[in-house]
Amino acid sequence: MLKDKINIQDSLMTILLNKEYKKIQMNEILKKSKLKSKKSFLYYKNKEEILIDFFERIDLIMKKKLINIKMSKNVKDNLFEVFMIRIDILKPFKKSVNNVYLSVKHQPNLFLCLYQSFFKTIKLILDLCYIKTDPIKGHLKFMIFALIYFSTIQEWFNDFSEDSEKTMSILDKRLGMFDDFFIQVN
């Protein structure tokens, strides 16, 4: 079952390399995955569910990679480390994920389907960095990091260097602007 779901997710990501998200049909994804359509529809009703599951898979991989990494006492360093691990995991899917982000701009309904998944990822990153997200200051930290994450991902899409040097520099600057805030209110 898990293998089939990953196959379907990867099929969608492969199609996204050359096709706009809104033009992709479920039967095309299922055909690419080479699974029987009856079996496939047991897993996913629509392509939005596939995307959500894909991003949950990325979250799980990120969480597993961080098990062996000892977090420092510096919040900024932790956020930087976790973010860059996520970027490394997403790297093979960069063009496809960019296509999804571009589609969100033009398809508000897609945003409505994916926003919970996005905020779940932000919450996970903050939790992994031991940043409290309790009300009221916690919500502010949450929103600030969501903006940093989203804007840095946008920069990453335009960073074609092998080691994501430009992205790392931008992330470091943006986290640096809020470093004191994250530490003081934690």
Predicted regions: what they are:
Residues 54, 58, 62, 82, ...:
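Hydrophobic/aromatic residues within well-ordered alpha-helical segments
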Residues 150-153, 157:
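Short, amphipathic alpha-helical segments that act as regulatory/interfacial helices
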Residues 108-131, 139-150, 179:
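Amphipathic alpha-helical packing segments from all-alpha helical-bundle domains
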Residues 53, 67-95, 99:
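Hydrophobic alpha-helical connector segments
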Residues 127, 158-186:
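C-terminal peripheral helix-coil segments that are non-catalytic and often amphipathic
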Residues 15-53:
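Helix-turn-helix
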Residues 3-12, 29, 54-58, 62:
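Generic hydrophobic, amphipathic alpha-helix propensity
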Residues 28, 81, 99, 140-148, ...:
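Amphipathic alpha-helical interaction segments
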